[in-house]
């Protein structure tokens, strides 16, 4: 259960807690912990369709699922044969949205380098952790695009 995230300021760079996830094909990415409410596992047998969306019943509401590996062309995402999906739950305007990832790997502290971000991109920058450069997912942008085309 993740209820909240902490962050600290050092100079003018912000250190934040980040959830490191795998998208398959050896691609790891980071999600700001402040964008995460919960980390869940969802049974594939619980998936349903509503309009063009894949959804799951979650805490007495219908939660749409966003296939993050598919967005980044990393893996099969929803197409994988696993019985269980790893889902990062995000709240947008009071509603839960599930972000499907291949695996939830770790929670680390990192400073987002926004200089590598591309305007209008699904990547908001990157962090360095364990001697690796990891792109940070722009959750706000992904959710906006999803809601624009959902239905």
Residues covered by each model-derived region:
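Conserved secondary-structure micro-motifs at functional edges
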Residues: 1-151
